[in-house]
C-alpha cells in the first residue's frame, strides 16, 4: 500500500516539521571557475550603497576611496551605508551606562591577551592570502614566508615570538621605501626521456628576488584575496568571501578578542557561544519579555533579516567604536586596536583569477587575468559583464579594486555584533520614554527583535523606531524578508523557537555517514555523531537505532568489509573470509575485519576495540594492538581525538571522539603529484618545520613547542637543555665519561656553527 506522506504531519505542529523543508540532503552546490564576477558584484554593490559619500584619493597608493560616513540621512527604504558617527558613539555610551564597567574590564582582559599571545596564533586558520607569492597558501606557510621576508629586510622584532612584536614589524615594513621578496617561478624544458626515448616536459622550480616599492608593497599588505564561498545550500547565486593577508590578521585578532570579551558580557549576544548554551541564553531573553508583558501588554517577535550587512558596515565606524571603548586606556593599546579598522578603510580587493574565454570554432581557450581588465577591449564580454567592468574600472590598480567602504564577509563578526546589541539595548523604557519597549538577540548579521506595547499601534511604532535607529548606524533591516509573529514563535540563527526550541534535525544530516579518515576513526566518529544527536537534537531511540544500522551498512560498503559469512563479493572478501574461518570467537572481530556489529543505542560511548576486547582471540588481540606491528599508528596515542564534522550551516565544527590506536588507525600518505608543482618548495618548508618541532619535543617532552619561554631561540634552548640533561645523567652514573664529553663537544660545535652563520 502507498503511504500518503502528508498523513505523517497530521499530528505534528508545523514548527516541528520545519526540518523537512531544509535543503540539507545530498551534496551541497560547489562553485566552478573564477570568483572574479562575484567579487566585482560585491565591490560595485558596496559602492552603490554608499554612492552619496565623499570621494578622496589615498596619498600612498593612489587608490580612489569613497567615504559615506555622516552622509545624507536616508529618504527611502533602499539599503544604505551612511552611518552617523555621533549616533554610533551615543549608542556605545548608552550600552556602557546599562552595563557599568563593561568596556573597562574587557580592555583589561584584552591587554593581558595582547601581551601573552605568540605569533603562532596566526598559523591557525585555513587559506590565507600570501602577499609574497600573490596567491593563497595554508596559514602556517604564509606566516613563515612573511617572517622570512621581514627577516631578510632587517625587521627582527618578531624573533621573540610575541604577536605584538610581529605587528611592530608590520608597522615598520609599511614605512620602508622598498621591500625585497623571494618569489617562486617554474621553468619548463622539453627533454628526451632516457628510458622511453619520448619527449617529456621537465619542470624545475626557481626562486628569484624581486623588489617592491612602497606603493606596491602597501597595496599587497592591504589586499584581501577573494574566493567563491562553496557549499552554500538554499541559494541560487554564489557569493564572494575574502581572505586577508598576514599583515592584517594579527590586528584583526586583537580587535575581535576585545569584541568577544564584550559579547560574553552581553545577554543579547548570540556570539561567541553556540549550541545548547546559546539556546539557553536566547530562552532567557524570551522568558523575560513574556513575563513582563503581563495581561495588559502585547508582545510580538520579528524574525529579522538585514540587507547586505557586511556591505553597509563601515570600518570608519568601527574605528569610532574602538576609540570610544578604549578611551581611558594607554596609548600603545589604543594604537594597536585602531590599526585594523584603518587598514580596512584602505583595503584593496583582489579580483581573483580573471575570466576564461574559449573559441568554439578554433578550439582555443585563453585566460584573461584580472590585471588585464583595466584596459582590455570590452567587445569580447557579454552585456552583463561589460557593465560590471565599466563600473569597476576607475577603482582598479594592479588587478585589485580599491574598496574602502564595506567589510567583506566574516571579518569583524564580534565587533559588528556589539554594534547590533547597542541598538537592541536602546529599547529599554528608560530610553524609549514611551509605552513601547524592545529587546532581542543579535548574532553577527542575524537578529530577532521582541517588541512589547499596550496595543498594536504601539508595536508598530516600536518596530518603526527600531528600524530608523538601525538606519542611523548603517544597519538595514529588510522589510521584505523580516516577518512578525506573536512572541513564542520565531527563528534565530536557524534555531526555531516555539514555546521552547524545536530540534532542527536536518541541520545535522550532513555530518552522518562515513568520514573517510580511516577505519578506526570513521567507526568512532559515526557512532559519536549518533550519540551526540540523541543528547542534543531529539534523535529518538527508534530513529537512532535505524541511523546506526544505516551507518554500519554504509561503513561496510565504504571499506568493503562485509561480514565474513556473507555472499557479497568484493576485492577484500577473499582475505576476510579466510580470517573469519580461522577465528574461534567471531564476535570479537572488528566490523572492519568482517566481524558482526555489536553496537546498539546503549553502548555508543564505548570504542569498538574496548567493546569487543574480551571476545577477541588472543592472537587477534596481539596483531591488532601490538605497538611492534609496523601498521599500528605510532603517533602519540591520545585517548581523545578531534574530527571535523560539517553541520549544515556555520563553520565546520570540531567534534571529540575516543581514539584507540590499532592497525586500523593508519594515516594516508600525501599525494605525490604535489612534488612536481611549484608548491614543492612550500612542502619542503613544511617538512623542515615539522622536523624541527619533533626534535624540540624530544628535548622538552612535557612541553608543547608552541610556548617558547623567554627570548632564546629553539636551538639555544635545546643546546642548554642537552647540557643540563647530560650533566645529570653523568653524575647519576647513567652515562660514561666519554659519552658525556662527546655530548659537550657536539653542543659546542652547534654553537660555533650558529656564530659563524
Swiss-Prot record:
- Example GO molecular function term? RNA binding
Q: Where is the signal peptide?
A: none
**Stretches for region Disordered:** 50-81
What reactions does this protein catalyze?
RNA(n) + a ribonucleoside 5'-triphosphate = RNA(n+1) + diphosphate
- Kindly state the subunit structure of this protein: Influenza RNA polymerase is composed of three subunits: PB1, PB2 and PA. Interacts (via N-terminus) with PA (via C-terminus). Interacts (via C-terminus) with PB2 (via N-terminus); this interaction is essential for transcription initiation.
Q: Report what the protein is called.
A: RNA-directed RNA polymerase catalytic subunit
Any Pfam family: Flu_PB1
Protein species of origin? Influenza A virus (strain A/Silky Chicken/Hong Kong/YU100/2002 H5N1 genotype X3)
Q: Name one GO cellular component term.
A: host cell cytoplasm
Return the broad EC class: transferase
Recorded E.C. number(s)?
2.7.7.48
Q: Which gene encodes it?
A: PB1
As annotated in the record, motif Nuclear localization signal runs over 187-195, 203-216
PROSITE patterns attached to this UniProt entry: RDRP_SSRNA_NEG_SEG
Q: Which UniProt keywords apply?
A: Eukaryotic host gene expression shutoff by virus, Eukaryotic host transcription shutoff by virus, Host cytoplasm, Host gene expression shutoff by virus, Host nucleus, Host-virus interaction, Inhibition of host RNA polymerase II by virus, Nucleotide-binding, Nucleotidyltransferase, Phosphoprotein, RNA-directed RNA polymerase, Transferase, Viral RNA replication, Viral transcription
